[in-house]
């Protein structure tokens, strides 16, 4: 008789995805982030569901409902901070996951990669709308500034912004629809994750060498399940330290002041994980130009398969390209720092230089370096 996990229609799918899945024998800890992101998404949906039970999406009561969750609900403070810091954790893992994909050339799986970029957009949209819900000062002004960017779109811009707001400013209608979208998007993300995995399992995983590993595969369980559990424990350790010791470390103090349309905070800035894109947006003096640069700073990821000029897939044996990638990482850290600084000298100049080098490294220097390395292979 066949094993139930191989014959049952539902269990069979799980078996092919997580148990008997043939996996390269040499994948490193950098391949842990996918499963960690899955756990993170699950945690966010669960904590979000419990928060939604007590939250009210109304401008008059939103702020006080969040206060009520933290003060009066059993372990409400923990659920709230787990959700807020879980989002930060999500983005940390997401950026590591994308970085791994760039380093090891995983972007050559075109469908998987492009769905991943769409997933990044969806997660960013969800996080942005979630940040608006507590209805603090930074929630309100962040929503005002970011939605206002759409007014830069020629002809339809201003109408589009008013349509999104549901009025002539960010108000009750905006908060209600943002809550609705914030609730539904994680489920759309979950569906997209399944498609992401479907396409990944069509080709099989990449590995650090970038070579075909069909001749050397091992079952996913128990080898990688146990390896993923180690990663999970480390992630939970970091997350719990954040939640229990310094829950407000990554937040903005301004968001503890209720939203006031008559009082603008001195520095309007998004959450830390959007600061690099915010710095790119601010580095261009023209509104439409800034919006295009902001969109392209993420969309540029879709160009990686096209810009790949190297004869080797992975960067494991390409020290010059490695060097460039680490310069890009340093550049992104500088952009993140600049995004949180006021718009004044010298930060404006640093931001403009960092934004320019971000696009130069990806569009010009990396393909050129790969081309040069191909030449060195012939020596």
From Swiss-Prot:
<feature type="transmembrane region" description="Helical">
    <location>
        <begin position="226"/>
        <end position="246"/>
    </location>
</feature>
<feature type="transmembrane region" description="Helical">
    <location>
        <begin position="178"/>
        <end position="198"/>
    </location>
</feature>
<dbReference type="InterPro" id="IPR048260">
    <property type="entry name" value="Cytochrome_b_C_euk/bac"/>
</dbReference>
<dbReference type="Pfam" id="PF00032">
    <property type="entry name" value="Cytochrom_B_C"/>
</dbReference>
<keyword id="KW-0408">Iron</keyword>
<keyword id="KW-0812">Transmembrane</keyword>
<feature type="transmembrane region" description="Helical">
    <location>
        <begin position="288"/>
        <end position="308"/>
    </location>
</feature>
<keyword id="KW-0813">Transport</keyword>
<feature type="binding site" description="axial binding residue">
    <location>
        <position position="97"/>
    </location>
    <ligand>
        <name>heme b b566</name>
    </ligand>
</feature>
<keyword id="KW-0249">Electron transport</keyword>
<dbReference type="InterPro" id="IPR027387">
    <property type="entry name" value="Cytb/b6-like_sf"/>
</dbReference>
<feature type="binding site" description="axial binding residue">
    <location>
        <position position="182"/>
    </location>
    <ligand>
        <name>heme b b562</name>
    </ligand>
</feature>
<dbReference type="Pfam" id="PF00033">
    <property type="entry name" value="Cytochrome_B"/>
</dbReference>
<feature type="transmembrane region" description="Helical">
    <location>
        <begin position="113"/>
        <end position="133"/>
    </location>
</feature>
<dbReference type="GO" id="GO:0008121">
    <property type="term" value="F:ubiquinol-cytochrome-c reductase activity"/>
</dbReference>
<dbReference type="GO" id="GO:0005743">
    <property type="term" value="C:mitochondrial inner membrane"/>
</dbReference>
<feature type="transmembrane region" description="Helical">
    <location>
        <begin position="347"/>
        <end position="367"/>
    </location>
</feature>
<keyword id="KW-1133">Transmembrane helix</keyword>
<keyword id="KW-0830">Ubiquinone</keyword>
<feature type="transmembrane region" description="Helical">
    <location>
        <begin position="77"/>
        <end position="98"/>
    </location>
</feature>
<feature type="binding site">
    <location>
        <position position="201"/>
    </location>
    <ligand>
        <name>a ubiquinone</name>
    </ligand>
</feature>
<dbReference type="InterPro" id="IPR030689">
    <property type="entry name" value="Cytochrome_b"/>
</dbReference>
<keyword id="KW-0679">Respiratory chain</keyword>
<dbReference type="InterPro" id="IPR016174">
    <property type="entry name" value="Di-haem_cyt_TM"/>
</dbReference>
<keyword id="KW-0479">Metal-binding</keyword>
<keyword id="KW-0349">Heme</keyword>
<dbReference type="GO" id="GO:0006122">
    <property type="term" value="P:mitochondrial electron transport, ubiquinol to cytochrome c"/>
</dbReference>
<comment type="function">
    <text>Component of the ubiquinol-cytochrome c reductase complex (complex III or cytochrome b-c1 complex) that is part of the mitochondrial respiratory chain. The b-c1 complex mediates electron transfer from ubiquinol to cytochrome c. Contributes to the generation of a proton gradient across the mitochondrial membrane that is then used for ATP synthesis.</text>
</comment>
<dbReference type="InterPro" id="IPR048259">
    <property type="entry name" value="Cytochrome_b_N_euk/bac"/>
</dbReference>
<keyword id="KW-0472">Membrane</keyword>
<keyword id="KW-0496">Mitochondrion</keyword>
<protein>
    <recommendedName>
        <fullName>Cytochrome b</fullName>
    </recommendedName>
</protein>
<feature type="transmembrane region" description="Helical">
    <location>
        <begin position="33"/>
        <end position="53"/>
    </location>
</feature>
<dbReference type="InterPro" id="IPR005798">
    <property type="entry name" value="Cyt_b/b6_C"/>
</dbReference>
<dbReference type="InterPro" id="IPR036150">
    <property type="entry name" value="Cyt_b/b6_C_sf"/>
</dbReference>
<feature type="transmembrane region" description="Helical">
    <location>
        <begin position="320"/>
        <end position="340"/>
    </location>
</feature>
<dbReference type="GO" id="GO:0045275">
    <property type="term" value="C:respiratory chain complex III"/>
</dbReference>
<dbReference type="GO" id="GO:0046872">
    <property type="term" value="F:metal ion binding"/>
</dbReference>
<feature type="binding site" description="axial binding residue">
    <location>
        <position position="83"/>
    </location>
    <ligand>
        <name>heme b b562</name>
    </ligand>
</feature>
<keyword id="KW-0999">Mitochondrion inner membrane</keyword>
<comment type="similarity">
    <text>Belongs to the cytochrome b family.</text>
</comment>
<comment type="subunit">
    <text>The cytochrome bc1 complex contains 11 subunits: 3 respiratory subunits (MT-CYB, CYC1 and UQCRFS1), 2 core proteins (UQCRC1 and UQCRC2) and 6 low-molecular weight proteins (UQCRH/QCR6, UQCRB/QCR7, UQCRQ/QCR8, UQCR10/QCR9, UQCR11/QCR10 and a cleavage product of UQCRFS1). This cytochrome bc1 complex then forms a dimer.</text>
</comment>
């Amino acid at each position: 008789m066949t094993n139930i996990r191989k014959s049952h229609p539902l269990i069979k799918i799980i078996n092919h995805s997580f148990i008997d899945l043939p996996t390269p024998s040499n994948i490193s800890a950098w391949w842990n982030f996918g499963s960690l992101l899955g756990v993170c998404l699950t945690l966010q949906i669960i904590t979000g569901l419990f928060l939604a039970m007590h939250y009210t999406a109304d401008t008059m009561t939103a702020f006080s409902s969040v206060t009520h969750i933290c003060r009066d609900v059993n372990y409400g403070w923990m659920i709230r901070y787990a959700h807020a810091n879980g989002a930060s954790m999500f983005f940390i893992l997401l950026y590591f996951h994308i970085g791994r994909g760039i380093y090891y050339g995983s972007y050559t799986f075109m469908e998987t990669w492009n769905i991943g970029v769409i997933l990044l957009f969806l997660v960013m949209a969800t996080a942005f709308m979630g940040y608006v819900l507590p209805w603090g000062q930074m929630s309100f002004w962040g929503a005002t500034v970011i939605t206002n960017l759409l007014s830069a779109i020629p002809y339809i811009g201003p109408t589009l912004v008013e349509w999104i707001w549901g009025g002539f400013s960010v108000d009750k209608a905006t908060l209600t629809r943002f809550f609705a979208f914030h609730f539904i998007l994680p489920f759309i993300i979950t569906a997209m994750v399944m498609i992401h995995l479907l396409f990944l399992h069509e080709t099989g995983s990449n590995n650090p060498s970038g070579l075909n590993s069909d001749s050397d595969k091992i079952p996913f369980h128990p080898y990688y399940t146990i390896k993923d559990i180690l990663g999970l424990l480390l992630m939970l350790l970091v997350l719990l330290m954040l939640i229990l010791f310094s829950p407000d470390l990554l937040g903005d103090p301004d968001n503890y002041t209720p939203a006031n349309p008559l009082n603008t905070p001195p520095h309007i800035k998004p959450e830390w994980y959007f600061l690099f894109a915010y710095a790119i947006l601010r580095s261009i003096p023209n509104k439409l130009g800034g919006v295009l640069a902001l969109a392209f700073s993420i969309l540029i990821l879709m160009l990686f398969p096209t810009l790949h000029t190297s004869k080797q897939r992975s960067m494991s044996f390409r020290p010059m390209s490695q060097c460039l990638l680490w310069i890009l990482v340093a550049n992104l850290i500088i952009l993140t720092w600049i995004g949180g600084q006021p718009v004044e000298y010298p930060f404006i100049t640093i931001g403009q230089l960092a934004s320019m080098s971000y696009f130069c490294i990806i569009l010009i220097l990396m393909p050129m370096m790969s081309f040069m390395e191909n030449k060195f292979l012939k020596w």
